[in-house]
Amino acid sequence: MSIEQTQLDTAHKASTEFSYGKVIDDICNLKWSHLDREGLTNVAWVYYYFSVQFRENLEIARSLYPDDDRLLQLDHGERDTNNLSPWPRVAATGEKMNHDEFMRRTLKLTTVAAERQRRLEEIGKTYLTKVRSMDRMSRAVSIASYEDGGLENVFRAIVTAQDWDGPLLQAFKHFLTEHIRFDSDPEQGHGALCRHLTPNDRILPLWIAFKEILLGAAPELAT
């Protein structure tokens, strides 16, 4: 067994001690491999809003723990960074940006019908309103659940989808596969930089809200 897999299994074991770990498993067990191009595009749209709340949660964590060097190092890998650059029509060589900005630009690569876009934007905006009503500490410690195996498992599930044709989905897949790489590094991975925040079930509503927007965008994931 690889070091990366051992680390992922350990993180999964820790998360399953809490109810939010079951929600992560539920998300991973959705029918990702059957999702078509339209469904994947919808997921990319609502994931953009998740990436906004992730960035905000990291900013909250940094404000609560301004002297935490590990969180500072994590921050350097998520905000104002060139670690997703270059990517055609999204990021120039060496260009620094927040990761949610990469996703925002990604959505511009393929036009969707106006009514469909309004529906997806409404799902995302409602989600952000819900998340922003939650307490700051829960939002801060959620970072550890995302970075220390949670999102890596979700991303590995998403990339089992078969149809990634088109510039938007190619950019989204680049985002996902690079984040798998960032999070799985056994020594300097993003999970190693924040697991000391020790999440518990105070973050359960955040994971439930994430699952809800994925299913809202692509209800066929559950059928």
What kind of region is each of these model predictions?
Residues M1-D69, V131-S138, Y146-V154, T160-Q170, ...:
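Terminal targeting/low-complexity segments that flank the catalytic cores of oxidoreductases
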Residues E4-A14, R70-F175, A222:
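Active-site-proximal alpha-helical scaffolds that flank and shape metal-associated catalytic sites
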Residues Y49-F50, G77-T81, T126, F182, ...:
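A short structural micro-motif
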Residues L72, H174-R181, Q188-A192:
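A structural feature that tracks compact, well-ordered secondary-structure segments
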Residues E147, D183-S184:
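Extended, basic/helix-rich recognition subdomains
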